[in-house]
Amino acid sequence: MFKFHAIKLRINIRPPNSKSQGFWLHFGLAIATFVGIICLAVLPAITQQPVTVKVLIQALEGTQWEPLVEDFNNEHPNLRLEVVKGPNNTNLVEDLYTSAFLLGDSPYDLVYMDIVWVQKFAAAGWLSSLSDRVTETQLDAYLEGDVNGGRYEGKLYRMPFRTDGGMLYYRTDLLKEIGAEPPETFEELMTLSNTLQEQELVPWGYVWQGKQYEGLSAMFTEILEGYGGFWIDADTQEVGLDKPEAIAAVEFLRDTISEGISPPGVTTYAEEETRRLFQNGNSAFLRNWPYVYSLASDSEIAGKFAIKPMVHQPEHGSGACLGGWGFGISASSDNQDEAWTVIEYFSRPEVQIKYFLETGYVPAKTSLFNDPQLVAKFSYLPDLLNVVQNPVLRPPVAQYAQASDILQRYLSAALTGSQTPEQAMQAAANETRALLKR
């Protein structure tokens, strides 16, 4: 057996004498004072660290943001905006956001979104509604299409920042040479192209984005609008891809190739391939986005081109496919008020003017299209306003990415001749209906 022995500890405490008592009293006061000074100096630094608001963005635009980020951080010492630079491919940025949300709490407080991401992200519950943070009067300052593109089921999930819209570029000098006005209809576009080519003034009449990618869906949205057709009615879920108007829209694009108005390789062209053809003087007409204007203004066709809304059938109107970017707030963020502070900063007119002057992007605020500073540098902005005020949205449905993939595949089949327009559009409509039912 084990034996335990108690150990007694005796401590003798003697009353301090007056000298030692005074010493310890002063020593204790000195220690307390020192600790107090340390707490006053250190605790605020610990408890008042800046709150970090993180956002993922394409690398190119992230670099362009750097002056604004620096200004924001200097202006808000208790906040720190941190930009994570992702790939320049927008689809890959969307994938990174999606992966972050699917894995749980997203590391991003702000969500910088393409307009076609909004419904998918909102339907999944990944975004916080902004409806209680902004009034309708404040939203009236923005292009209506950009605001509507940020809504899902009646609530606002994206605050517009910059916009985009498809349009028709045309050579003013070539049209002047044949004594013609710019085209208003599809038929006039074909006739003028043919005339210019027959007179050997230009190799190709009209170039557009025919590659199988998102740009094909965007371009086709405008042609479809011009024929009076529709893709998906977001309210009723009706699909219009197999209707006569949609088939006629596909046939028009096929005709531009078969009649030699567009080059055979147009079915492999994205924005840049078509821009270079037009900018190098090899095409009379071009469908593209606003970014082309600044680049073409520094080329051999400077001063020899203009822009207008897309052509259309006489009995129907024109529509510019709406693009653009804006801000949402992650539903899982612990810093939602701070994220809104960032959005408010980027919404200030003086901040936007500074940014657009440097980058050439197009504002989403209507008043900025006539701002003297911006117009002095980008004289086309007032004309561009006429284009983007007549927008056509890609279908604002939660399954947009899958619907676009379906359309791209079957459009490509029709344009390359592996299926007839009727066959391709019927199949596209059937797959889209099945998708929406799921």
Q: Residues of each region from the PLM?
A:
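Glycine-centered hinge/linker elements that transmit conformational signals in sensory
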Residues: 192-195, 199, 235-267, 310
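Extracytoplasmic/periplasmic substrate-recognition and gating elements
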Residues: 74-75, 80-85, 98, 156, ...
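Extracytoplasmic/periplasmic solute-binding protein
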Residues: 153, 157-161, 166, 190-239, ...
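A structural signal for short loop-to-beta-strand junctions that line the ligand-binding cleft
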Residues: 99, 106-109, 137-174, 204, ...
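Hinge/lid segment of periplasmic solute-binding proteins
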Residues: 113-165, 181, 190, 216-221, ...
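Long, aromatic- and glycine/proline-rich binding clefts that accommodate carbohydrate-like moieties
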Residues: 48, 303, 308, 357-409, ...
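Conserved C-terminal helix/tail region of periplasmic/extracytoplasmic solute-binding proteins
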Residues: 2, 24, 30, 49, ...
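Extracytoplasmic "Venus flytrap"/periplasmic binding protein-like
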Residues: 71, 75-142, 149-151, 173, ...
